[in-house]
Swiss-Prot record:
The gene is Aqp7. Residues 40-52, 118-152, 203-206, 221-238 are extracellular. The modification Phosphoserine is found at residue 5. One of its GO terms (molecular function) is water channel activity. The record marks 59, 208, 214 as: Selectivity filter. Detected in proximal tubules in kidney. Detected in the capillary network between muscle fibers in skeletal muscle and heart, and in spermatids and on spermatozoa tails in testis and epididymis. Detected in white and brown adipose tissue, especially on small blood vessels (at protein level). Detected in kidney and white adipose tissue. Aquaporins contain two tandem repeats each containing three membrane-spanning domains and a pore-forming loop with the signature motif Asn-Pro/Ala-Ala/Ser (NPA). GO terms for biological process: glycerol transmembrane transport; renal water absorption; water transport. Its main location: membrane. Glycerol transport is regulated by pH, with the porin being permeable to glycerol at pH 7.4 but not at pH 5.5. Water permeability, however, is not influenced by pH. GO terms for cellular component: cytoplasmic vesicle membrane; lipid droplet; plasma membrane. The lineage of its organism: Eukaryota, Metazoa, Chordata, Craniata, Vertebrata. Disruption phenotype: Young mutant mice appear normal and are fertile. However, they start to become obese after about 12 weeks and display enlarged adipocytes. The effects on plasma glycerol levels vary between experiments; some reports find no significant difference in plasma glycerol levels in fed animals. Others report decreased plasma glycerol levels in fed animals. After fasting, mutant mice display lower plasma glycerol levels than wild-type, and increased glycerol content in their adipose tissue. After fasting, mutant mice display lower blood glucose levels than wild-type. This is Aquaporin-7. It comes from the Eukaryota.
Length: 303
């Protein structure tokens, strides 16, 4: 028997579900973060090139594109808090948690590096070559969130937990087939709109990281790239809040929806029959797609 070629070996590895899900989370998070961080760079560095609304649209539609990239493979969580909640509530196995989060962290870190390279000249010009974490010429806030002076650490914690809870509650609602889910095929757009709405309504106080995978890897990049230890010390050691608070908030938001709303949905037989018929059609279409070597699993319900 002839030895397997390198290409065949790579294809064999990529066919494993865990590997595919890792790569899906990596690429979807990378796409989301490039659009999101790029929009922040425009607001910080360009006098008239960006705005706060632009940042929210950048992250919102970045999420939409990320779900389009990987929604049919991993569900495109792009958020360690969402992954944690799905594992904690039994909607996916814990063995997938490190795979998803590692993919998200590496994708986010890579996006931060990409953003730095794209805006390298503008970053150096903006602060005269200095890499500052605080002050009017700060550029570290392009990559991670920092607490404003009027906010205390614990108020920021509650803010992050609450906004992430709203995110998770609405994600469960959007993908709940027994309630009023988004129309089939519109889920990426609706989820992106959700992120945009959270930003324009609740994002001012803490920068609405609402995602450990969005905040910690870029912060680590800035530490390595020259901004130094101040990226962890600023804001009374704010760095850990966008990591811990979203985990708690998403979990509580998930419990609120599954505990209060999901059991209260009327089990109308005709409605359930309609959902079953729709699901059978969707399953059949994905089986046909699979025969054409296209992935047929769309686990968006993991949200």
């Amino acid at each position: 028997m002839a030895p397997r070629s390198v290409l065949e070996t790579i294809q064999s590895v990529l066919q494993k579900n865990m590997v595919r899900e890792f790569l899906a989370e990596f690429l979807s998070t990378y796409v989301m973060m490039v659009f999101g961080l790029g929009s922040v760079a425009h607001m910080v560095l360009g006098e008239n090139s960006g705005s706060y609304l632009g940042v929210n649209l950048g992250f919102g539609f970045g999420v939409t594109m990320g779900v389009h990239v990987a929604g049919g493979i991993s569900g495109a969580h792009m958020n360690a808090a969402v992954t944690f909640t799905n594992c904690a509530l039994g909607r996916m196995t814990w063995k997938k948690f490190p795979v998803y989060v590692l993919g998200q962290f590496l994708g986010s870190f890579s996006a931060a590096a990409t953003t730095y390279l794209i805006f390298y000249g503008a970053i150096n010009h903006f602060a005269g070559g200095d890499l500052l974490v605080t002050g009017s010429k700060a550029t570290a806030n392009i990559f991670a969130t920092y607490l404003p002076e009027y906010m205390t650490l614990w108020r920021g914690f509650l803010d992050e937990a609450f906004v992430t809870g709203m995110l998770q509650l609405c994600l469960f609602a959007i993908t709940d087939k027994k309630n009023s889910p988004a129309l089939q095929g519109t889920e990426p757009l609706v989820i992106g709109i959700l992120v945009t709405v959270l930003g324009v309504s609740l994002g001012m106080n803490s920068g609405y990281a609402i995602n450990p995978s969005r905040d910690l890897p870029p912060r680590l990049f800035t530490f390595i790239a020259g901004w130094g230890k101040q990226v962890f010390r600023a804001g009374n050691n704010w760095w850990w809040v966008p990591v811990v608070a979203p985990l708690l908030g998403a979990y509580l938001g998930g419990i609120v929806y599954l505990g209060l709303i999901h059991p209260s949905i009327p089990q109308d037989p005709q409605r359930l029959e309609n959902f079953t018929a729709r699901d059978q059609k969707v399953t059949a279409s994905y089986k046909n797609a699979a025969s054409a070597n296209i992935s047929g699993s769309v686990p968006l319900e993991h949200f």
